[in-house]
Design a protein with these regions (language model features):
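Canonical Rossmann dinucleotide-binding motif of NAD(H)/NADP(H)-dependent dehydrogenases/reductases
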Residues: 3-33
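Short, small/polar-rich loop/turn modules that mediate ligand/substrate recognition or access, typified
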Residues: 87, 174, 179, 236-238
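Substrate-binding pocket helix/loop in short-chain dehydrogenase/reductase
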Residues: 97-98, 102-110, 206
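Active-site helix of classical SDR
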Residues: 121, 158, 166
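Alpha-helical segment proximal to the catalytic Tyr-Lys
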Residues: 126, 171-175, 234
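Residue(s) in the substrate-gating loop at a strand-loop-helix junction
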Residues: 142
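Short C-terminal tail/terminal secondary-structure segment
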Residues: 147, 226, 237-253
Length: 253
């Protein structure tokens, strides 16, 4: 198994892509640190991993709180004895006209999607450097890191920012043997996107966004995350791995 004796910390791990990635890492032998703002949901995922025979520990984490992030990583390291991968997955999005988008909502999206990713990545990198261990950071990106969509101004801006952050962190952290990559999903069916699937017309529109004429499933993203975090991708850093079913080639607004 690719991650035996490795410890993986996942933010936004309570549902959708985060949950599935936690299960996938555990299946490959990893200790999984399940973090989320919703502790009850994080515990549920950790219990699910443990019930399947995996090793996991839940933590409540607000990714915008630097002190809390430092404490969580320190506690995870004390509990498992290592910290090898950080999957920066926590994120939110808005669907509202930019003319009606409040500054409070703008700041919330940017704070979680950009500042939260930076805090997680920076804290993890410092941990690796202080402990003289190599590390892997994987960031959940989006097709909107290179394009746009109606009424998602803050979200699109945040994903463009994290795309640049991925490249810059990869350049700056390579000398410490820390790789930084991102995965760029198309529309994945998760609790966050469930509103797209409420009727046939909406579902068909989602299909038409992709050249493959279907939406993605969380396991199709978790497979990409595990690849980027594994030794199979040992010469890969600064990349944004596209897993979008041909979204950028086949979208039809």
């Amino acid at each position: 198994m690719r991650f035996t004796n490795k410890t993986v910390l996942i933010t936004g791990a309570a549902g959708g892509i985060g949950r599935q990635t936690g299960l996938s890492f555990a299946k490959e032998g990893a200790n999984v640190v399940v973090t989320d703002l919703d502790f009850d949901m994080a515990k549920r995922v950790a219990d699910e991993i443990q019930s399947a025979g995996g090793s996991s520990e839940p933590f409540k984490l607000d990714v915008t709180n630097q002190d809390e992030t430092i404490e969580t990583m320190n506690n995870a390291y004390k509990h498992f004895g290592s910290l090898d991968v950080a999957f920066c997955n926590a994120g939110i999005r808005e669907i509202v006209s930019p003319l009606e988008l409040s500054i409070e909502e703008w700041r919330k999206v940017i704070d979680i999607n950009v500042t939260g990713v930076f805090i997680t990545a920076q804290t993890f990198a410092k941990h690796c450097i202080n402990n003289k261990t190599k590390g892997n950071i994987v960031i959940t990106s989006s097709t909107l890191s290179i394009t746009s969509a109606p009424n998602r101004c803050a979200y699109t801006a945040s994903k463009h920012a994290t795309a640049g952050m991925t490249k810059q962190l990869a350049m700056d952290l390579a000398k410490y043997d820390i790789r930084v990559n991102a995965v760029r999903p198309g529309v994945i069916r998760t609790p966050l996107t469930e509103r797209y699937f409420q009727d046939e017309e909406a579902s068909q529109k989602v299909r038409n966004l992709h050249a493959m004429k279907r939406w993605g499933e969380p396991n199709e993203i978790s497979s990409a995350v595990l690849y980027l975090a594994s030794e199979e991708a040992s010469f890969c850093t600064g990349t944004n791995l596209i897993v979008d079913g041909g979204w950028t080639e086949g979208k039809d607004w």
